[in-house]
């Protein structure tokens, strides 16, 4: 997003044109594309990526960990550590240096009050920032309208919860989805539909507490209805499934162990995909899992992938593998031989190729 809207109302058409060229080349090779408004941790200011700096400049956010019964309840799951406690050094643009960012924990950053509260301000359109985001999507939709290989638009990647340290209701599974995100998605949809009324919306639930990292990990209630009436808009329930979300200790060393990958992880993916499939059915849309994997070059990675795919076949769920490359940005800092599917010399990581080479079950079995 920040690479396209570099200043309020100012868009980088050259960058978008390069994206369009890539999409065209993929179409020539029979590859389907999802246009994803990708972000993690909202902004470079918070050691993440996604939103332009002017978004943060116009939004209010808290640096305080409120000590009350609500924070005590949430404290059962994690500790509140403000980002201001990190001893980051900043560059000439006032942004934390990547060397300092990667020294901390991606998970811990998500628990910070600054991050939770800035999401809350954004979702509520403080100072018209959400209006700016709608205009961003309208600009993008003009470029990709009618493209045959574009499956749909993922409106916002992994929306984080409102400030869990303050708002007790946000700890209730499904509350943020139904009372904040539905309205958020509907507002974006209204803008996109002015440009591309035939597009397909992909909408995501919040990762926590909709997925609870206790007792082996469980997917809980999310949306009770689609953000927009199904008779008006094509929509897909878009979820992610990572074993690290099953329990706080599963990925304490970075990734699941081989023992977890062949046992607990497979069970978690089965429970989660079963619940997600039922949720999608209840609200009358298909489900798609657009992120799983993102694991390193290891035997454990291979078996976790197989466990996930077995569950996806069982529940007839479409999926896409998520991979990182070593681009050295703030949230994709994987080593060259990890998390992607290529080795540094350009050859494929054969075990991942093997794990991902699966027949499309609905094609050869038809609908059950």
Predicted regions and their residues:
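Membrane-proximal envelope and lipid/glycan-remodeling enzymes
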Residues: 17, 21, 26, 120-121, ...
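Extracellular glycoside hydrolase catalytic/binding regions
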Residues: 124-152, 156-315
């Amino acid at each position: 997003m920040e690479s396209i809207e570099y200043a309020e109302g100012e868009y980088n058409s050259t960058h978008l044109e390069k994206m369009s060229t890539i999409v065209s080349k993929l179409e020539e090779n029979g590859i389907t594309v999802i246009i994803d408004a990708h972000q993690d941790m909202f902004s470079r200011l918070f050691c993440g990526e996604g939103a332009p700096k002017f978004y943060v400049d116009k939004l209010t956010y808290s640096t305080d960990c409120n000590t009350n019964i609500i924070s005590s309840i949430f404290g059962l799951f994690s500790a509140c550590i403000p980002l201001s406690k990190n001893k980051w050094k900043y560059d000439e643009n006032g942004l934390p240096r990547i060397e300092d960012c990667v020294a901390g924990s991606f998970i811990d950053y998500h628990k910070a009050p600054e991050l939770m509260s800035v999401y809350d301000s954004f979702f509520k359109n403080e100072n018209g920032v959400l209006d700016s985001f709608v205009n961003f999507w309208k600009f993008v939709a003009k470029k990709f309208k009618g493209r045959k290989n574009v499956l749909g638009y993922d409106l916002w990647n992994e929306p984080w919860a409102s400030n869990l340290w303050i708002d007790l209701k946000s700890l209730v599974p499904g509350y943020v989805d139904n009372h904040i995100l539905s309205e958020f998605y509907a507002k974006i949809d209204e803008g996109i539909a002015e440009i591309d009324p035939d597009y397909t919306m992909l909408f995501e639930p919040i990762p926590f507490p909709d997925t609870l990292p206790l007792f082996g990990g469980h997917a809980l209630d999310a949306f009770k209805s689609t953000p927009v009436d199904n008779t008006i808009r094509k929509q897909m329930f878009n979820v992610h499934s990572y074993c690290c979300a099953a329990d706080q200790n599963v990925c304490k060393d970075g990734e699941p162990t081989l023992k977890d990958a062949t046992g607990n992880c497979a069970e978690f993916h089965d429970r989660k995909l079963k619940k997600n499939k039922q949720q999608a059915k209840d609200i009358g849309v298909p489900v798609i899992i657009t992120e799983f994997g993102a694991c390193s070059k290891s035997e454990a990675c291979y078996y976790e992938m197989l466990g996930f795919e077995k569950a996806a076949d069982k529940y007839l769920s479409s999926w896409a593998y998520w991979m990182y490359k070593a681009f050295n940005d703030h949230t994709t800092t994987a080593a060259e031989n990890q998390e992607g599917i290529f080795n540094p010399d350009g050859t494929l990581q054969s075990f991942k190729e093997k794990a991902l080479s699966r027949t499309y079950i609905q094609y050869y079995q038809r609908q059950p």
